[in-house]
C-alpha cells in the first residue's frame, strides 16, 4: 500500500499529501500501521507533555483502533438510522483492560477513537456473558447493539471481568477484534468519564458522539469556540470535556 498509494489526509485540508505528512500527521506514540487517519486529539501530546503527565503521577495506557475511511464519511441521511458505520480493528492489551477495570470512574479518553474503543469493550463483555467462548467475529460490536435494553444490564466492572476471564481461558495477552459502534444522543457511557478532543465538522459521527457525551450541550460549547476564534478539525484546538 505504501508503494501504490499515498497517505490519506482529511479532504478539508484542500491540498495534496506532502512527504512531511508522514511525520507531522501522526502522534508521537503511534506504533502499529493500519489506520487511514491519525487520532488527531493525540497530536497535542508532545514528548514534553507526556513527560509532564507522568511527572504528575497520572497513569496512561495505550490501545489500538485502526481508524476506517468512514471517519470522513458525512452523515447524509435524514436520520441517524440511515447512516452505516464502517468496521474498525481493535487491539487492547490484557494489562490495559485490567488497569481500566481497577480505575473505573477515572477514565479520560484521548480522542473519539479511544472513546469508541473503550466503550466497545463493555459490549464485548456483554457478549461474553451469554457466549463465553465467542469467536473474534462474534465479539464485533454491532452498530446498534448499545441501544438494546438487554445489552445494558451488566456493570462495567462485570463486563471487563468477562473479558479478562476470556483472555485467561485462551491464554491470550491481548484482545483483538473489531467494532462498528455508533455513539449518538441517547447513548449511556459505561467506561469513559472524560474526553480530550478537537472541534469537529458538522454532520459527522464525531459530533454525534460529542453531543451524546455532553447531553446536548454541544451547541453552547461550539458557539463559545466560534466566538473565541478556536481552530477546528485535525490541526485545530483541543478541549477537555467532563
Explain the meaning of each model-derived region:
Residues 1-242:
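Surface-exposed, charge/polar-rich loops and edge strands
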Amino acid at each position: 500500500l505504501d508503494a501504490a498509494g499515498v497517505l490519506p489526509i482529511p479532504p478539508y485540508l484542500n491540498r495534496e499529501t506532502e512527504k512531511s505528512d508522514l511525520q507531522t500527521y501522526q502522534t508521537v506514540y503511534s506504533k502499529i500501521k493500519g489506520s487511514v487517519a491519525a487520532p488527531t486529539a493525540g497530536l497535542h501530546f508532545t514528548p514534553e507533555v507526556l513527560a509532564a503527565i507522568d511527572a504528575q503521577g497520572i497513569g496512561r495506557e495505550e490501545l489500538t483502533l485502526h481508524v476506517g475511511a468512514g471517519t470522513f464519511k458525512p452523515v447524509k441521511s435524514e436520520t441517524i438510522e440511515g447512516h452505516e458505520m464502517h468496521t474498525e480493528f481493535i487491539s487492547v492489551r490484557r494489562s490495559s483492560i485490567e488497569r481500566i477495570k481497577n480505575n473505573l470512574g477515572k477514565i479520560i479518553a484521548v480522542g473519539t477513537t479511544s472513546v469508541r474503543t473503550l466503550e466497545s469493550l463493555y459490549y464485548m463483555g456483554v457478549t461474553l456473558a451469554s457466549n463465553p467462548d465467542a469467536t473474534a467475529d462474534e465479539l464485533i460490536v454491532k452498530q446498534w447493539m448499545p441501544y438494546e435494553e438487554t445489552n445494558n444490564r451488566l456493570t462495567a466492572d462485570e463486563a471487563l471481568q468477562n473479558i479478562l476471564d476470556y483472555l485467561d481461558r485462551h491464554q491470550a495477552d491481548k484482545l483483538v477484534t473489531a467494532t462498528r459502534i455508533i455513539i449518538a444522543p441517547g447513548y449511556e457511557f459505561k467506561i469513559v468519564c472524560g474526553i480530550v478532543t478537537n472541534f469537529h465538522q458538522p454532520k459527522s459521527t464525531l459530533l454525534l458522539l460529542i453531543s451524546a457525551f455532553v447531553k446536548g450541550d454541544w451547541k453552547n460549547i461550539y458557539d463559545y469556540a466560534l466566538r473565541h476564534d478556536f481552530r477546528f478539525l485535525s490541526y485545530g484546538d483541543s478541549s477537555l470535556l467532563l
